Amino acid sequence: MTWRVLVHNDAINSFAAVAYALVRVLSMPVEHAAAAARQAYESGVAEIGAYTEREPAEAITARLQAFGLNASIEVAA
């Protein structure tokens, strides 16, 4: 089973705030963080990671939520 971590577009966080949180929480390269933030902004959601264990996905989701992002996990189909 694969657990996907998703970031959703919202009316609160700016593009820059989303990219910043992805860099800080995931140590994601700035270019990748900007691309993920743009995808969330344009399509409403961006997958930022996929994990074979539920616990790491939940931990990352909680950290993103602590930054104020609208993040969730789902089981990949």
Residue ranges of model-derived segments:
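Terminal domain-initiation and capping elements
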Residues: 1-77
